Amino acid sequence: CTKGNAMDKYEVLKKYWGYDDFRPLQAEIIDSVLDGNDTMGLLPTGGGKSITFQVPAMMLPGLTIVVTPLISLMKDQVDNLLERGIRAYCLHSGLTRAESRLVTDRCRLGKVKMLYVSPERLQSETFIENLRAWDVSLIVVDEAHCISQWGYDFRPSYLKIKTLRKLFPAVNVLALTASATPEVADDIMAQLEFRPGWQKYVKSFNRSNLSYIVRYDDFKERTLVRALKGVPGTAIVYVRSRRRCRELAEMLEKEGISASYYHAGLDPQDKAERQNAWKSDQVRVMVATNAFGMGIDKPDVRAVVHFDLPTSLEEYYQEAGRGGRDGLPSYAIVIASRSDKALLAKRLADAFPDKDYIKRVYEQAGNFLEVAVGSGYNQIYEFDFSLFCQRFKLQPVMAYSAMKLLTQAGYVEYVDEIESRSRVMIIAPKHEFYSLRLDEVTDSVFGELQRAYTGLFADFVHIDENHLARRAGATAEQVYQSLLTLSRMKVITYVPKKSTAYLFYTTSREEPRYLLMPKAVYEDRREAMAKRIDSMRRFVFDSTQCRVSTLLQYFGEKAADDCGTCDVCRARRAVAPTKEQAAQLRESVLYVVGRNPGCTIEHVVNTVRGNRADAIEAIRALADDDLIAVKGVTLHPLQTSES
């Protein structure tokens, strides 16, 4: 790789993102990539992973390929880049053939800077053939822990990334993840066949502005309300089930706390509206499953509450890390009950149903999709998972686990998060419009379509039928029928929105008796999950060790001191400062900040006399009273402090 652009990294950052400087380790990772090194970046949640490949992508001469498993996040990033004037596209199972062809043609012609692909795309022989003709400058592996069998989210399709290495042996690889133990990090580099001279950058897992608190209560709702009333500002509450999302949001509303809910089963437009209401502070609390939060960079989340326990410390750390990205003191709260230990054990049993059950689910899926034994190889099928479970009377959690295990064993690729908004492209030439014979409603819809959206002749454009209906004075159903009519007339290509799952056969359908569940997929992964659950259980139910020390130890990092702000450290301290002591501490903080404008929170905490937790509390109080301003991790006086 060469630095093939006259602009340096700071100019690129300023031009496209408007920032003057990089976050910690971003510049070092970018330099390593531009120097042609295979590079590993371990940047905890909120560390700005995407900038580390998007900036070099704009400086390198050819195409940057980004492999990522999260289709919703992929689409969000592409939309964001297009808004910045960067030519970015994505390829995934939810696109039509016409859309896929449009993207691959542009890549062939060198008109794309960044191409996001889902890992299963690397199993397509057609895609691999297309790749050979492209000028590729960089390969990026996002969520790189998915390539490791020891990781908490192993995806076999990630192993196909090695195909890219063989196709482009001279092109370097950037692997990125937010949470990986040392064992997983080493495995990632081994799986991606890092070459000599590789570089590894690990940002500390310590988030000094986050206070980790565990509360024990069998009546969790009571503690949740108390916590949210005690911590002002935006919050996320994580739960494990869709039903509980709705129930808790309704309960919080009754308690006078503004709340909404979010899960994967919601309509795409409904999701977008709820997400925007929360991001713009119209809604204070979002109750959500783990489908919420990826790629959402809201800096002022003051509390992340886990109402249900996650299965691993990797998941917990990633979700808790969505709090306090602005550097201000924030809380990561776990609410635990006595029954949670048993629930964690049940989760292990649900994740690994017995092998006969897995074979049965495989056979039933083939029957449901009408795929004959010996056929189906490399075919993709729409898969209504709810209907499948109803028809065969399957318990959804265990059936889903069976699908994941079949995916990990390499028989199928189950993709359950594809959502596509409606999109339209005009395919008829303009001069033919005058001879079209359209009814009044269709004519009005077609006219408003062209007025409301740009770029319709060049590409598929996302549209909103309800918005078109309001403009055309029609109903959404009339708009839908009008667009279908125009599509049948070959005036437009119309792809209506849908939310569906897919099942992709990576091998021909087998007889169940020949199905093998390898030890590495079943027994070894079951043991690894049992260890992760045990680490989660100890983190929550062991009240003798500082929570931060426990977390850092798990991720292979040594804590210099106990944090002083978690519930364990606070309990040791026991005695709260008097009003006079608290006032004196606030004065000390004001004095230090006044003399050192722009100093870090860490500097102030280490400089003033007193307990760490009390110092952070003093900073919080001064910021609330508008006496100091917090910008990132730095503090600035809003009034002159007198000596």
Descriptions of predicted regions:
Residues 3-16, 20-24, 28-50, 57-60, ...:
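Helicase motor core with emphasis on the C-terminal RecA-like subdomain
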Residues 354-508, 514-618, 625-631, 635-638:
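C-terminal accessory/connector segments of nucleic-acid motor ATPases
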Residues 29, 137, 303-305, 494, ...:
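Residue-level detection of beta-strand scaffold positions
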